[in-house]
Amino acid sequence: MSDLYIHELGDYLSDEFHGNDDGIVPDSAYEDGGQFPILVSNRKKRRNDDMGSGTNHLKSNTFIKREANMLGKNPWPEKDSGGSSVSRDTGTGKDVQDMTLEDTNTSDHGFNGGHVDVVENFSTGDPMLCDTSAATNDGVYNYSLNSIPDAENDLSFFDNGDKEKNDLFYGWGDIGNFEDVDNMLRSCDSTFGLDSLNNEGDLGWFSSAQPNEETAGAMTDDLKPDKMLENQRTAMLQVEDFLNNSEPNHAVEDEYGYTIEDDSAQGKSSQNVFDTSLQKKDILMLDVEANLEKKQTDHLHHLDGKSDGFSENSFTLQHSGISREIMDTNQYYPPSAFQQRDVPYSHFNCEQPSVQVSACESKSGIKSENKPSPSSASNESYTSNHAQSIESLQGPTVDDRFRKVFETRANLLPGQDMPPSFAANTKKSSKTDSMVFPDAAPIQKIGLENDHRKAATELETSNMQGSSCVSSVVDDISLEATSFRQLQQVIEQLDVRTKLCIRDSLYRLAKSAEQRHHGGNRPEKGAGSHLVTGEADKYAGFMDIETDTNPIDRSIAHLLFHRPSDSSLSSDNNVLSYKSHPMIPQPNSSPSLRIEKQEETTELRPEAEVVTSDNN
């Protein structure tokens, strides 16, 4: 809006009201509510200098009526912004009669002219835009912002009543031109360009990154920062109490029920850490037991470079549910280093990481194992004396289980081959990578070792004795199996007819051999009837039996059985072959064999006569 328009408006209103002597300069509180504020140039000379003091007061209710008729009611709706309620009834003469205007206290925020009388109550719903230096008794504002206590003032950060500027509102920064306003709105600054704030703590609930709409909503909503800060303090106190009550216990309990103290809780006491006096007593007691048992078990378990001293190391003794922790007075080792049964080894001491100790837990006691290190002799005997001193009854170890298995096999299977170095390996088990001490007293260990040697010796002797018998039986079985496999391979290469021929031939050869062996009655043949003497008759009968078979049978017999000169041996071999290779007796059922026998009968008889003549 240009300055010319403002001047013309001011002249029009001034002439009208001066003529009736009803001119009035509006109070600075009568503003547009931030909607369309009218800025009047300060360069224009004030016209209220010509007006007397009588024009500064209301004389009658005539102007109130004209005001209501001319401008009407306020067209802009009011907003309930949490402040005092704004009265819409501006036509009452009681409120306007008491209204006075003093030129010395008139602010430059409103219409900057003494005779420029805006006759409408620019009621606003935003009390922060009101001039705090003006006295408002017309019901528009029941109180000023300066008089509001801090506990009840929602917007106390605009409390800058002692400051007077030529700008539109108090408390706002100097706005040079439209670009400054545009930059301020684009940046969405929640402080709205304020240079200095009296109550910066109350702005903590505003976010500088909030959008403009959210910022306006946060300013206009009925939100009380004091209550919000109080709620935040209450929440912080609750969190602090929770953290104090739930302070982490530095004594952490692991999965095995042990208590492990953290580095930050060194000053605190743990229930599993016993007094030093009890530890010293246990150490002395174990020292005495070690000295007594060392003399009895020294000849069984020896390590190269074993020291006679007693090394105070941290390990756990558990017997019948009673646990004792023997700790080094200089250094505490957490119980997590003591592994349970079936748990791999863990490094026990940081100074000697090569030595690994496993303390196995059981109902009857505990068993300690020492894995020696090849680095030095002292490290190899790291816990050997302790292990000898705390030997107690327990379940079988791996070595004991293997020994029992070997003994059982020795009793049940004396013919099996056992490793000859079994005794040497078990005898030198203390010098292997893992030294395992048997779970018995020294006397019992001596007896077990002697029994072990005897069992190993018996195994070796039984193996030597049974090796010859087993070898002979295996040779026989292997010979027969080899022959059978060879015969099977040959037969697989023949056709079905050849296989049937061989079967029938073997059957006839077996029958003839059986007849010769028993010496039964033989039918007389025409070819042998001319024989007179008994000896000739014997040979003639033998040849007759042989001639009952065909040439194929004889060739098969010569191929399969090498018949010796003695007939008795030949018959025995034939009988053995018959019993070892039984055949199905079907010689007469085969028509091909009968045809062959009839065709070869004429050829076999002359041949038999030639043989008998040669014998004579």
UniProtKB/Swiss-Prot annotation:
Main subcellular localisation: nucleus
UniProt biased composition (Basic and acidic residues): 594-608
Keywords: Activator, Biological rhythms, Nucleus, Transcription, Transcription regulation
BP term (GO), one: entrainment of circadian clock
UniProt-recorded Gene Ontology molecular function terms: RNA polymerase binding; transcription coregulator activity
Compositional bias of kind Low complexity: 567-577
Chain positions covered by the region annotation Disordered: 72-112, 361-398, 410-434, 567-616
Locations listed in the record: Nucleus
Knockout mutant characteristics: No differences in hypocotyl length when grown in complete darkness, but longer hypocotyls in plants under continuous white or red light. Lengthened circadian cycle.
Induction remark: Circadian-regulation. Maximum levels of expression in the subjective morning. Up-regulated by a light pulse in the middle of the night via the phytochrome family of red/far-red light photoreceptors. Up-regulated following a temperature upshift during the dark period. Repressed by members of the TOC1/PRR1 family of clock genes.
GO cellular component terms, semicolon-separated: nucleus
Chain intervals with Polar residues compositional bias: 371-395
Tissue expression as described in the entry: Expressed in roots, stems, leaves, seedlings, cotyledons, inflorescences and siliques. Highest expression in root tips, young leaves and vasculatur tissues.
Signal peptide: none
Record flagged with keyword Acetylation: no
Additional notes on this entry: Unable to bind to DNA, but recruited to the evening element (EE)-containing region of the PRR5 and TOC1 promoters through its interaction with the DNA binding proteins REV8 and REV4. The evening complex (EC) nighttime repressor is implicated in the temperature responsiveness by binding to the LNK1 promoter. Also responds to some extent to a dark/light transition in an EC-independent manner.
Subunit structure and binding partners: Interacts with CCA1, LHY, REV4 and REV8, but not with PRR7 or PRR9.
Biological role stated in the UniProt entry: Transcriptional coactivator necessary for expression of the clock genes PRR5 and TOC1. Antagonizes REV8 function in the regulation of anthocyanin accumulation. Involved in red light input to the clock. Activates clock-controlled genes with afternoon peak. Mediates light inhibition of hypocotyl elongation.
Protein name as it appears in the record: Protein LNK1
Species this protein is from: Arabidopsis thaliana (Mouse-ear cress)
Lineage: Eukaryota, Viridiplantae, Streptophyta, Embryophyta, Tracheophyta
Gene name as annotated: LNK1
